[in-house]
């Protein structure tokens, strides 16, 4: 996995929730982001992105630079009430794995990317929200079959979703159409084009925010 691709996965982890106080050094790139800045649903999506970012890197053999310059996220702090008991337990284990510099161990029973996606979906984003980071990571890790499975699952979820004040019927139909287009691209072996597009989107966004410094 190249530095640029890994940085993109990392940028996906930080793109939702930007702030001060935490520094991650990932394969030559310096990124700053704060975990606890806004509403619980944003925190949830951020954590899911962080899981996929770190664990995809671990699965693909990219070592994380957890040097003395890196502040381990204080997952069990003043705001843990937003997670509930299950969330607190998972995040405590995750923090422990980070401190021990062994992220892979955290998901030892889910060594595959699909296992990681399943797990993050279950504990972080159980509703019908568009959990983009999961299939983004699959595409970026060059696992199109995994991305197809996840995108297909999302399409089915959107079809069964009931519109409400936050999600309209038109929005759901748009998501279905977009996801089906991505599936078609991947099935036709066009994953490289989609991967390049995701890289450009994420990397460009991080540059605009001043959160990426080239090594």
Give the location of each predicted region.
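Intrinsically disordered, low-complexity regulatory regions enriched in serine/threonine/proline
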Residues: 26-215
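Long, charged, glycine-rich C-terminal linkers/tails
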Residues: 20-24
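Amphipathic alpha-helical segments
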Residues: 1-19
């Amino acid at each position: 996995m190249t530095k640029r691709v890994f940085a993109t996965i990392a940028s996906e982890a930080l793109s939702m929730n930007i702030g001060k106080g935490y520094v991650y050094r990932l394969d030559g790139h310096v990124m700053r982001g704060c975990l606890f800045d806004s509403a619980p649903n944003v925190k949830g999506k951020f954590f899911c992105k962080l899981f996929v970012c770190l664990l995809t890197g671990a699965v693909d053999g990219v070592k994380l630079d957890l040097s003395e310059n890196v502040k381990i996220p204080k997952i069990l702090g003043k705001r843990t009430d937003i997670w509930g008991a299950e969330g607190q337990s998972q995040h405590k284990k995750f923090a422990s794995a980070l401190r021990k510099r062994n992220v892979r161990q955290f998901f030892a029973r889910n060594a595959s990317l699909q296992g990681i996606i399943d797990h993050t979906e279950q504990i972080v984003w159980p509703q019908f929200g568009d959990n983009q980071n999961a299939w983004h990571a699959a595409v970026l890790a060059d696992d199109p079959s995994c991305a197809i499975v996840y995108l297909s699952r999302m399409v089915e979820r959107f079809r069964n979703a009931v519109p409400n004040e936050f999600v309209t019927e038109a929005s759901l139909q748009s998501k279905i159409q977009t996801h089906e287009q991505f599936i078609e691209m991947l099935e036709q072996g066009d994953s490289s084009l989609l991967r390049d597009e995701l890289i450009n989107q994420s990397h460009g966004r991080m540059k605009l925010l001043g959160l990426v410094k080239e090594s």
